Amino acid sequence: VPDDRYLSLIALRVFRAGLRHSVVDAKWANFEEVFWHFDPEKVVLMSAEHIERLMQDTRIIRHLGKLKSVPRNAQMLLDIRQEFGSFGAFLAQWPEDDCVGLWRYLAKQGQQLGGLSAPRFLRMAGKDTFVLSDDVVAALVAQDIVTKRPTSQRDLAPVQEAFNAWQAQSGRPLCQLSMLLALTVNH
C-alpha cells in the first residue's frame, strides 16, 4: 500500500472522530483533491496560510485542529519512510504482541491520534489490533483485568497481556478477540 493511502486513512480516521462517518465519507473526494491525494511529500509543505485558506473551503469539514494534523501526520510518515522504507513496512515489523506500544507511538509522533483513533486507524489499515470500545472495557472490568477505562501505560499493560494470552490460547486475531469480548457484555 503506498504511503499516500496510509496518510489518507489517517486523515479519514481523524476527521471521522466525533462526527458521523457518513458526513465525512460524503466529502472525502473533496479532501483527496484539496490535500493533493495525500501525497506526503506535497502535504508536508502546506503552510499555515494554506491551512487557513482551507478553513474557507465549504467542500470539506472545516476543523482547524484536524486540518493542521494532516501536514504533521505527513511528516510522521516521511520520517518513518526514511527509517523503514515505507509506512507499510513499519507497520509490518511492529510486534503483534505490542499493540499498545504502537498506539502510543502513533499518538506521540502523529497528531490527533490519541484515544481510540490509533487503534481504529490500524483496523482500517488492516493491522490486527484490539479496540477498547465501551463494551470491551466493560468486559475487561467484569473479568477483573482493569477497574476502569485504561488510559495510562500502567493500566494498559495488563490489557495487552490478557489479549496476548487469549491470542496464544485461541489462535484468533486480536480484532476477533476484541469483538468476541464485546459480545460477552449484557445490556
Residue spans of the language-model regions?
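N-terminal polyanion-binding entry modules of DNA glycosylases/AP lyases
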Residues: 1-63, 67, 180-187
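Buried hydrophobic packing segments
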Residues: 10-11, 73-77, 140
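Alpha-helix N-cap and coil->helix boundary residues
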Residues: 23-26, 45-46, 82, 131-135, ...
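Short, well-structured alpha-helical segments
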Residues: 25-28, 64-74, 115-122, 137, ...
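Alpha-helical ds-nucleic-acid-binding substructure associated with the helix-hairpin-helix region
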Residues: 37-112
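C-terminal accessory module of base-excision DNA glycosylases/AP lyases that mediates lesion recognition
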Residues: 92-187
